[in-house]
Structure formats: C-alpha cells, structure tokens
C-alpha cells in the first residue's frame, strides 16, 4: 500500500525538480544549485570559476535552491551517491541528512 502526500515546492534553481531516474531507483537525484554560491558554509573549500573546490578533509554546504513545505511527522532524507564517495571521497557528513518540517533546503 502506498500513500500520496502533496508537498508544495518552490524551485528557485535552474535545475528540474528531483525525480526517479530509473524504474528501479530507490531515491530521487537531487542537484546542486551553483548560481549564487556563498562562502559562508565552506570549510577548507573555495569557489573557483563557478565551481566548488573541496580540499582534502574539507566540508561544504551546497545549496539546492529548493524550498518545500514538509508536513509534520514526515521527513526527507539526503544520502550520498555511492559513486561520488568511492571515486571522489565526497559524501554527506551526517548520513542520512534529515530534513523535517522545521527545515527546508
């Protein structure tokens, strides 16, 4: 049994909304919004030519420019792509990252 929940979304990015890329996908692909980057949440990382460069052991909070109204009692989870972690050492620090009714990304 599945339940459908309507979640209002404001997309201020230039990216399409997240969606399942294949029929067997367990989650949707979320894309970074790199148009208005700030250095406020970069630690051992910097912006160069519109790209975020993360130094070894560095951290960065990357915006999506998506804003959602998540119903109370529900959450979204952000998980790393296994290929990014394996090939480049990029992961989500607090895996899974929880976005609940009090937060939006």
Predicted ranges, named:
Residues 1-105:
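DUTPase catalytic domain/fold
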């Amino acid at each position: 049994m599945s339940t459908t929940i309507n979640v209002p979304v404001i997309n201020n990015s230039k990216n399409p909304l997240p969606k399942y890329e294949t029929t067997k996908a367990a989650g949707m692909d979320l894309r970074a919004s790199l148009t208005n980057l700030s250095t406020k949440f970069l630690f051992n990382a910097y912006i160069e030519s519109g790209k975020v460069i993360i130094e070894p052991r560095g951290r960065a909070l990357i915006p999506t420019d998506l804003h959602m109204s998540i119903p109370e009692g529900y959450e979204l989870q952000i998980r790393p792509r296994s290929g990014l972690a394996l090939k480049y050492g990029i992961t989500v620090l607090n895996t899974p990252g929880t976005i609940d009714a009090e937060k939006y990304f």
